[in-house]
Structure formats: structure tokens, C-alpha cells
Amino acid sequence: MVRWSVSAELSRAVAAMGIRDPAVLRAIAEVPRDLFVPPRLRHQAGADQALPIGFGQTISQPFVVAFMTERLHLTGLERVLEVGTGSGYQTAILARLAAEVFSIEIVPELAARARAALLETLHLRNVRLRTGDGAAGWPEAAPFDRVLVTAAAPEVPPALTAQLAPGGRMVVPVGAAPGLQVLRAVDKGNDGVDLSTDLIPVRFVPLTGASG
């Protein structure tokens, strides 16, 4: 009961901050954020703030999770690549809104925790997980209709752009980390030409691996 009340409260909070997509709000209300927060911080799971999860990583602020998800413009039919599974919270949100989610985490310990939460506790069947360098993407599963990057890269990783399907969209924080970055939407036209739009300033941990 506590989990659901916390999630419902978060959904109302992000709605008050401007999130409008009913499906995104419903997903925020349904996913128990405390499941993805370290036990010592679970009393803060209902706060709209990023929290440390170890290994220099964080579980993102719920508003940012909702904003990024909303900007993917999901209809329920998409195959989504997530770069940076982290705690698995964003992955669980995506799983409720997309047909398939392919998520990559470079830190083995975090990947194992996320796997337990997503596959063993929540029993999500449309999620595939991999441990490795997310900046390289998941070539054998490409192309993807959507790509979501949950760590800041100095530039948009070219491998991810290459794996984005025509008509697809990527949402990625771009800029130096630590520090202030910009959340960028990259739309790939049916002609293969990319159009970039800067959305909001954000603060993310740095992308590690070849593009970090």
C-alpha cells in the first residue's frame, strides 16, 4: 500500500509540473519507485529528486524521467533502446509504454540489481537486458524506433544515431559532466537526415565507455 501511495503521489507531482501525457502519468503511478531505491533511502523514494544508487550513479528525478519519457512520443508499438539501465526505474516506466525495451548497463553490479527488480520482482516480459558499453548500442537488435540515453555524453554517440530507425527519435543529455547539460531530441527523417532540438537544461552523471 505504501508503494502505490508513493507512486500515485509522484504522478500527481509531475502532472503539477507540466507532464500531460495520461499514459506517462499512469506509468509513474503504477511503478513502485521504492523498489529501485537503496533500502537506506527508501523513505525518500517519494521525493522528486535524484538519489544515489552506488558506483557513482543515481536514480533520476521523477520529473526528469517523466519528461524524457513524454518526449519520446510513445504509442505502445515501439522498440526502444535504453542506454544506462541504472536502477531499472526508467526501464520499468518504458516497459509499460512500449512494445519492447532493450536496456544496457555498463556496471555489472547495477545490472544484476536491475535484472532482479525488473525480471524477478515485476516479471516484465518485454524487457531485454545486457551488460556492456551502451554507447555502442545493440547492433544485432537494431534498428530502434526510439533511443533513450540516461547519462550525459559530450556529443550524441554516432553508433546510436546509426541504430535509430528512419522516423525515429532519440532523447539524450549532451554536454560535459559533472555540470549542466542540455537534453536534446534527435529526430531521424525518413530521408535519413537528423534534426536536433534542445529541450531543457539537465544534470546527469557522465556516460561511461567509449563515448564517455
From Swiss-Prot:
PANTHER family recorded: PROTEIN-L-ISOASPARTATE O-METHYLTRANSFERASE, PROTEIN-L-ISOASPARTATE(D-ASPARTATE) O-METHYLTRANSFERASE
Enzyme superclass (EC): transferase
Task performed by this protein: Catalyzes the methyl esterification of L-isoaspartyl residues in peptides and proteins that result from spontaneous decomposition of normal L-aspartyl and L-asparaginyl residues. It plays a role in the repair and/or degradation of damaged proteins.
GO BP terms: methylation; protein modification process; protein repair
Protein's cellular compartments: Cytoplasm
Alphabetical keyword list: Cytoplasm, Methyltransferase, S-adenosyl-L-methionine, Transferase
Record NCBIfam families: pimt, PRK00312.1
Transferase found in the keyword field: yes
Active-site residues per Swiss-Prot or TrEMBL entry: 60
GO molecular function, one term: protein-L-isoaspartate (D-aspartate) O-methyltransferase activity
Highest rank taxon of the organism: Bacteria
Catalytic activity annotation: [protein]-L-isoaspartate + S-adenosyl-L-methionine = [protein]-L-isoaspartate alpha-methyl ester + S-adenosyl-L-homocysteine
Record-listed E.C. numbers: 2.1.1.77
GO CC field: cytoplasm
Gene transcribed to yield this protein: pcm1
Record family assignment: Belongs to the methyltransferase superfamily. L-isoaspartyl/D-aspartyl protein methyltransferase family.
Name under which the protein is recorded: Protein-L-isoaspartate O-methyltransferase 1
